[in-house]
Amino acid sequence: MMPDFTQQGTANSAVSPAAPVAPVVYFNGVSKSYGRIHALSGVTLGLSGGVTGILGMNGAGKSTLFKLLMGKLRPSAGEVKLFGVDPWKNPSPYAKVGFVPEHEKMHDWMTALEFVSTFARLHGMTRSEAEQEARRVLDFVGLSDVINKEIGRFSKGMRQRTKIAHALVNDPELIVLDEPLQGCDPLARTTIMNVIRELGKLGRTVLVSSHILSEIERITEQIVILHQGKLVALGNLHAIRERLDQIPHTIRIVGDDARALAKDILSPPAVFGVSFPNDHELLIQTYHFGRMHAELPRLIVDNGHNVRLIDNPDDDLESLLHYLAGGEV
């Protein structure tokens, strides 16, 4: 059974229940198979409002999920709905959707303004309306100073932001971004993350896929985790972190004198294992991951240690999946 990480409050009995509102994105028992290969198996979820990270290793089913959502694939079983409507019966919901695919399909000879305004025209805008909207969204993604530059001369990060701008030109209520940070330099990643967070604050429903846990953590707390085509977790990342405290974690500290450091900072029962790969490196095994990280800075400073690095070798998506999938990773 998939772990339930949703956090629900208590209903107020004095308030009459409101009419149910269909989620923006709804999958009900959705599967997609290619012969004996199951790309997605029995996925059920409903998403509305804010930013949700779609996490999974390569081949987990993230792109299949998005292709089903965008009508590029028909489900083998189950139903997919957008804004309460089956898009295979009525494609009108796609007028309210912006999609940023993983792979680039851009016209390098066009300027950013020409590229984005062309898509605005395809949404039925007049030439002047299209240019106005193109300028607005290019400014929103931080490209206002290069709107007349050819896309072929753009960096990877600038190209990604141009793709995001083209997906926003119709002012969509749902924005779907497939691996938007892949291949970007640190500055571009930070800029794109800021854009995604801002879209969530504006009340849009934003789905962003990644295979890197730390990327999603910097964008949102709401996540969906896929593994081998199955939904293994859905909900708040902090709740998942609390569950992870039930299993041992490794903390790696690199400093001038690993053994002296261990003597000053280690205190049972927080720590149940210690090892020294070399004179400068200390590995700590603990069940109290959050507590250790909260106490380490004070203990290091109070005891005058010179520490160059603190990291968590097992604090990644693969380790998280290993726990959620019962070790089958």
Task: Please tell me what each predicted stretch does.
Residues 249-319, 324, 329:
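Short, charged/small-residue-rich alpha-helical element at the C-terminal edge
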Residues 117, 121, 128-146:
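Conserved ABC ATPase "signature" region
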Residues 57-61:
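Walker A (P-loop) phosphate-binding loop of ABC-type ATPase nucleotide-binding domains
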Residues 193-285:
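ABC transporter nucleotide-binding domain
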Residues 78-93:
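Conserved ABC transporter NBD signature motif
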Residues 175-179, 184:
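Catalytic Walker B motif of ABC-type/P-loop ATPase nucleotide-binding domains
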